[in-house]
């Protein structure tokens, strides 16, 4: 099977979307299939040429230097698709290259599948061309794109419910991004001690993710301040970078916890895995995750998780078994963390259960589920994606739809 992946982000940019594409692609290749990625170039990061990766001219985004916006124009796209002989197109964005992929699927009569990775209306603050547009319009763009596809993949059942609630009529199937369990063998459990200012006596609270507004890291710092006041021998390690990093560092200084918070920046994949192995507890305050892949990774390393009860984490964390889900309340979040730090029996039980509970979402198993969907679509032969005409009372919405359609 020859699979065309159209995405608005790809390595060397780091995100859950990129990680998902990498994991599925690797598993597809291992099972004898071919994956071709159509994604952005990153002129400031100089990505190496890779076989099977076709990059579009891109413009660095002013507020996020590591992110680039692809220009969805290519005189060679049609000939490339015909030369490869794609069997299916899988898009990972309802914008730009995702739209280009949808047009290509319609033109070449290929089945079109879309993974809804992101609650797009929660991220409009990053994009000036839609930031003044209502969240309802951004939601509408995503809904109408879903309705152009043959099948929509949602990484959690709560996202399936959300898509149905906003009016998606296309068939929706729940397939999470799996966890590569083999990554978590033979790890360095003292890697943080060797490479950062982490004492062997400290309990390490770990966060992995983008340091952006949508990840709610400010909330986490306030909670950690309260935890540290009661349990001084603990440290918070933040793995990742993002537009809020300088603000968060300043906040740590103002709160008097800068000596207890470690910022690692972006790390190579293997070092991220070592961070999981070196930590004691995974803390995740985001309320905008469709899945929260990092939670599954933390559980694969045997870390109990404390997260906010919202969308993806609400399904990924088994409350009371391998971690705690709390309301968006500092006191509840702090109490859950302290319960695990101060109760060794509870911690040990949840740590063992964490690994057991993640085994059912291995990357190999999830990839096979996705391949079954591909096969079903290809065999149906009635998959021609349809073009939607967008009609909105909102003038800005009309303009955006006409531009992006």
Predicted regions and their residues:
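N-terminal subdomain of nucleotide-sugar transferases
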Residues: 1-57, 368, 375, 386, ...
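Donor nucleotide-sugar binding/catalytic pocket of nucleotide-sugar-dependent glycosyltransferases
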Residues: 39, 55-57, 135, 139-189
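Short alpha-helical donor nucleotide-sugar binding micro-motif in glycosyltransferases
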Residues: 81, 146, 266-267, 274-279
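Conserved donor-binding/catalytic core segment of Leloir-type glycosyltransferases
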Residues: 198-224
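Aromatic "clamp/platform" in nucleotide-sugar-dependent glycosyltransferases that forms part
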Residues: 287
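Short hydrophobic beta-strand element within catalytic cores of glycosyltransferases
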Residues: 295, 304-307
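Conserved acidic donor-binding segment of nucleotide-sugar-dependent glycosyltransferases
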Residues: 319-320, 324-330, 339-345
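A short, well-ordered alpha-helix in the C-terminal region of glycosyltransferases
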Residues: 332, 339, 346-360, 372
């Amino acid at each position: 099977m020859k699979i065309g992946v159209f995405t608005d982000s790809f390595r060397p940019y780091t995100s859950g979307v990129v990680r998902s594409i990498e994991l599925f692609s690797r598993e597809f290749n291992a099972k004898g299939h071919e994956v071709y990625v159509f994604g952005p170039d990153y002129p400031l990061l100089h990505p190496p040429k890779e076989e099977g990766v076709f990059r579009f001219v891109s413009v660095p985004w002013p507020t996020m230097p590591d992110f680039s916006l692809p220009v969805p124009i290519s005189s060679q796209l049609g000939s490339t698709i015909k030369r490869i002989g794609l069997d299916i197109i899988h898009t990972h964005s309802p914008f730009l290259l995702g739209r280009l992929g949808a047009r290509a699927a319609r033109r070449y009569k290929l089945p079109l599948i879309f993974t809804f990775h992101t609650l797009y209306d929660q991220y409009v603050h990053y994009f000036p061309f839609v930031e003044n547009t209502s969240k309802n319009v951004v939601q509408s763009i995503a809904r109408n794109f879903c309705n152009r596809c043959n099948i929509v993949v949602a990484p959690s059942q709560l996202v399936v419910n959300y898509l149905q609630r906003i009016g998606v009529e296309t068939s929706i199937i729940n397939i999470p991004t799996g966890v590569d369990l083999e990554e978590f063998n033979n790890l360095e459990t003292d890697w943080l001690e060797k490479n950062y200012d982490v004492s062997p006596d400290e309990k390490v609270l770990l966060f992995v993710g983008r340091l952006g507004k949508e990840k709610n890291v400010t909330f986490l710092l306030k909670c950690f301040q309260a935890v540290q006041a009661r349990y001084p021998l603990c440290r918070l390690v933040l793995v990742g970078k993002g537009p809020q990093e300088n603000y968060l560092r300043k906040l740590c200084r103002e709160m008097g916890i800068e000596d207890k918070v470690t910022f690692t920046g972006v790390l190579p994949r293997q070092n991220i895995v070592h961070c999981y192995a070196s930590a004691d507890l995974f803390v995740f305050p985001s309320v905008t995750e469709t899945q929260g892949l990092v939670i599954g990774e933390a559980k694969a390393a045997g870390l109990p998780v404390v997260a906010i009860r919202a969308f993806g984490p609400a399904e990924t964390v088994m409350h009371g078994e391998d971690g705690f889900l709390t309301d968006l309340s500092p006191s509840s979040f702090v109490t859950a963390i302290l319960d695990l730090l101060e109760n060794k029996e509870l911690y040990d039980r949840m740590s063992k259960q964490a690994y057991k509970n993640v085994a059912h979402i291995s990357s190999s198993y999830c990839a096979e589920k996705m391949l079954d969907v591909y096969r079903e679509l290809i065999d149906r032969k009635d998959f021609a994606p349809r073009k939607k005409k967008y009609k909105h009372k909102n003038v800005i919405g009309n303009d955006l739809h006409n531009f992006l359609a």
